Structure formats: C-alpha cells, structure tokens
UniProtKB/Swiss-Prot annotation:
HAMAP family: PdxT
Catalytic site: C75 (nucleophile), H165 (charge relay system), E167 (charge relay system)
Residues annotated as binding L-glutamine: G46, E47, S48, R101, I129, R130
Matching InterPro entries: Class_I_gatase-like, PdxT/SNO, PdxT/SNO_CS
Pathway the protein takes part in: Cofactor biosynthesis; pyridoxal 5'-phosphate biosynthesis
Encoding gene, per UniProt annotation: pdxT
Annotated keywords: Glutamine amidotransferase, Hydrolase, Lyase, Pyridoxal phosphate
Catalytic activity: aldehydo-D-ribose 5-phosphate + D-glyceraldehyde 3-phosphate + L-glutamine = pyridoxal 5'-phosphate + L-glutamate + phosphate + 3 H2O + H(+); L-glutamine + H2O = L-glutamate + NH4(+)
Family affiliation: Belongs to the glutaminase PdxT/SNO family.
Enzyme Commission code: 4.3.3.6, 3.5.1.2
The keyword Hydrolase is annotated on this UniProt entry: yes
Protein name: Pyridoxal 5'-phosphate synthase subunit PdxT
GO CC entries: cytosol; glutaminase complex
Length: 184
C-alpha cells in the first residue's frame, strides 16, 4: 500500500521510514493531487497553527474534509484532526474529541514515557514535545492510552490520533497499527 505523509513541516522522513519498515511505500505528499494516489495519510507533528495555514494555502483542508481517506495524526496532526480545540474551533473535525494544546508544558517540559497502548503493546515509547492531550471524547471514540489522567491516544473509524511522536523512536508499531487497522 501507499501511505502518504503530509510534507509541509515536521518529521516527514522519520514517518516515511516507519512506513517502509512496516512493509509499505511511503510518499512525501506536497501537492493536493497526490492525495488521490495514496491509501492513507499521516499528518506529522510540528506547529499546528503553521500546519493549518499551510494546509489552507495549498488546498489540503477542503480536499481532506471531503475525503474518507484514513488519517493518522501525531501531536500537531492530532490537533488538526480534532473536532474541537480548547478556546477555538477545530479544523478537519475528523475525530470527535476536544484537544488541549501544550497541556504537558513548554518545550523544556518535554519528556518520554513508556505507554500501554490498547491493541498495540504495553511498552511503546512515547516522545512528548509541547504535547497536547485529549480533554474530552465523544461517543464512538475509543481511548487507547493515557499518561496519568490525560488521554494521549484515540481511534475512531479510519482515524488514529496520538499526542506524542512515535516517529522519533525506532519502534514503528504505532504506524503498523494504523496501516493494519485503519488503512487495511
């Protein structure tokens, strides 16, 4: 299968590496027309306001809102997928969740944690960099993992969202899960 990584910002190469380790073709998506050539899409981390502006500029928002393409959002990608973001309206509104930005603190408060992610494994390394958390989930959203009392991974239909950066580790099981369970 062909899995795209939105290549407007973020750790694009690292995501493509995880896709390839999962046995699939990874494609850096730079043009909206490329969305028709892929089976699933990863929205990487970075800065969510910048990501939204670039998606608007290059025409990705409208195309993705109308699409039923499976999408995996990490960190800023999770924020972009959310129906609501505390203090503002959501963007793509694919996941029926409310996200709180930077809820683990500033850049200096970044951390790593071993996560038990339902359906994947009990020992997934999560890298949290100015990470959001999921403050609320609506019916139909399955919680996959938490850090303390904060939700950090969810799925709903063809959509997977995580607060952390799985691509910054050598463990590609979260990407493999997305491909196996959402893209198929």
């Amino acid at each position: 299968m062909k899995i795209g990584v939105l290549a407007l910002q973020g750790a694009v190469r690292e995501h493509i590496r995880h896709i390839e380790l999962s046995g699939h073709e990874g494609i850096a998506v730079k043009k909206v027309e490329q969305l028709d050539e892929i089976d699933g899409l990863i929205l990487p981390g970075g800065e969510s306001t910048t990501l939204r502006r670039l998606m608007d500029l290059y025409g990705f928002k409208e195309k993705l809102q109308q699409s039923d393409l499976p999408i995996f959002g990490t960190c800023a990608g999770l924020i972009v997928l959310a129906k609501d973001v505390e203090g503002e309206t959501g963007y793509l509104k694919k996941l029926d969740i409310t996200v709180e930005r930077n809820s683990f603190g500033r850049q200096v408060d970044s951390f790593e944690a071993e996560l038990d992610i339902k359906g994947i494994a009990e020992d997934i390394e999560g890298v949290f960099i100015r990470a959001p958390h999921i403050a609320n989930v609506e019916e139909g959203v399955e919680i996959l993992s938490t850090v303390g009392d904060k939700i950090v991974a969810v799925k709903q239909g063809k959509y997977l969202g995580v607060s952390f950066h799985p691509e910054l580790t050598d463990d590609y099981r979260v990407t493999q899960y997305f491909i196996d369970h959402m893209v198929k």
